[in-house]
UniProtKB/Swiss-Prot annotation:
CDD domains: Radical_SAM
More about this protein: Reaction proceeds by a ping-pong mechanism involving intermediate methylation of a conserved cysteine residue.
Molecular function GO labels: 4 iron, 4 sulfur cluster binding; metal ion binding; rRNA (adenine(2503)-C2-)-methyltransferase activity; rRNA binding; tRNA (adenine(37)-C2)-methyltransferase activity; tRNA binding
Organism: Desulfosudis oleivorans (strain DSM 6200 / JCM 39069 / Hxd3) (Desulfococcus oleovorans)
UniProt remark on cofactor binding: Binds 1 [4Fe-4S] cluster. The cluster is coordinated with 3 cysteines and an exchangeable S-adenosyl-L-methionine.
Record-given protein name: Dual-specificity RNA methyltransferase RlmN
Subcellular localization: Cytoplasm
Alphabetically ordered keywords of this record: 4Fe-4S, Cytoplasm, Disulfide bond, Iron, Iron-sulfur, Metal-binding, Methyltransferase, rRNA processing, S-adenosyl-L-methionine, Transferase, tRNA processing
Length: 371
């Protein structure tokens, strides 16, 4: 699949003349393996060296070109002159009582993002950010209060995975990636696609199965079909309401792409065999948790290969919404279940360290002295 060599990061990160070895060094992780092979070919170096270099970067997690002992010294010298191996700095770490870990990453320009490592029964899931801040303005999300600062580069997206992997004990396994952290992934489309290429590269990349990678969108409709053609990762859609008036209030993007437009994009989304779209539904007391809402949701999802992830609202300081009581949550779930939908109720983890759904804000002051 063809990818653009250039990515759409902030001006200071734009790659200029990367095919020219005299350009300023750039982070090599901003390239797909295929584009790096093109660069090697342009410098009269056998393209198969791209496989070797990427294995060093993402399988062996080398931090310098000198560690790449099966690459000749002249090639290593050229690589060191042309590229840098970027690594994100973990500025702070917090651990929840339930074992959830939240990482505050410091970027090269001084900005901060957060990632969350979520413990499951026998593995971990990493929630990854794709932007510094977010422009979507969802009423229930703390990231929205930060506003949009910039897109993350491919290196900064994959760097969160590498950073988390480095903290794992030998017996701990990271098997799942969810692009559900700070930012709207489809608003940073090119960089996200480039990073997914590396994350899901089973030979020389981070080696995650596409079945274990999920991208969540607020409903940026024009980018949905291209996503389905570019990758087979799982799609999750943050729906959160069953009528346009409520969704307009919760998610301003609905004024541009209302529910009927969003769901039509879901109906025509190029799903792989036996896959379903996950519809995320944050339950807020008195807002979208009634029996009528549940019945409308059933009607809306007809003819879509769908499953539903119910997320009881995670209350936080200054929040305008409340979590429904357990009876309301169970009633909503049962209505969907009785209509043969696969329904999960997300068990919120990390709420005591503001690491649960909707709570990421990269507020360094909340970390205190906890390293």
């Amino acid at each position: 699949m063809s990818r653009n060599l250039y990515y759409t990061g902030p001006p200071k990160f734009i790659i200029k003349g990367i095919m020219n070895s005299t350009a300023l060094p750039q982070e090599i992780q901003n390239l797909t393996r295929a584009r790096f092979a093109d660069w090697l070919n342009a410098h009269n170096i056998a393209p198969y060296r791209a496989d070797q270099v990427f294995k060093w970067l993402f399988v062996h997690r080398a931090e310098s070109f000198d560690q790449m002992t099966n690459i000749s010294k002249p090639v290593r010298t050229l690589l060191a002159e042309s590229f840098i191996i970027g690594r994100l700095k973990i500025a702070r770490t917090q651990q929840s009582a339930d074992g959830t870990r939240k990482y505050l990453f410091e970027l090269s320009d001084g900005e901060h993002i957060e990632s969350v490592l979520i413990p499951e029964e026998d593995h971990f899931t990493l929630c990854v950010s794709t932007q510094v801040g977010c422009a979507q303005g969802c009423a229930f999300c703390m990231t929205a209060k930060k506003g949009f600062v910039r897109n993350l580069t491919p290196a900064e997206i994959t760097g969160q995975v590498l950073g988390a992997l480095k903290t794992l004990a030998p017996e701990e396994r990271l098997t799942n990636i969810v692009l559900m952290g700070m930012g709207e992934p489809l608003a940073n489309y090119d960089n996200v696609i480039t990073s997914l290429d590396t994350i899901c590269d089973g030979d020389c990349g981070l080696q995650f199965s596409t079945r274990r990678v999920t991208l969540s969108t607020s409903g940026l409709v024009p980018r949905m079909a291209p996503l389905g053609l570019a990758t087979t990762v799982n799609l999750a859609v943050s729906l959160n309401a069953t009528d346009n008036k409520t969704r307009d209030m919760l998610m301003p993007i609905n004024k541009t792409y209302p529910i009927e437009v969003l769901l039509e994009a879901c109906r025509t989304y190029p799903l792989s065999n036996r896959r379903k779209i996950t519809f995320e539904y944050i339950l807020m007391a008195g807002v979208n948790d009634s029996e009528k809402d549940a019945l409308r949701l059933v009607k809306l999802l007809r003819s879509i290969k769908a499953k539903v992830n119910l997320i009881p609202f995670n209350e936080h300081e200054g929040a305008a919404f409340k979590r429904p009581d357990d009876a309301a949550i169970e009633r909503f779930k049962q209505i969907l279940h009785d209509r043969q939908y696969t329904v999960m109720t997300r068990q919120s983890k990390g709420a005591d360290i503001s690491a649960a759904c909707g709570q990421l804000a990269a507020d360094i002051k909340k970390y205190g002295q906890n390293k």
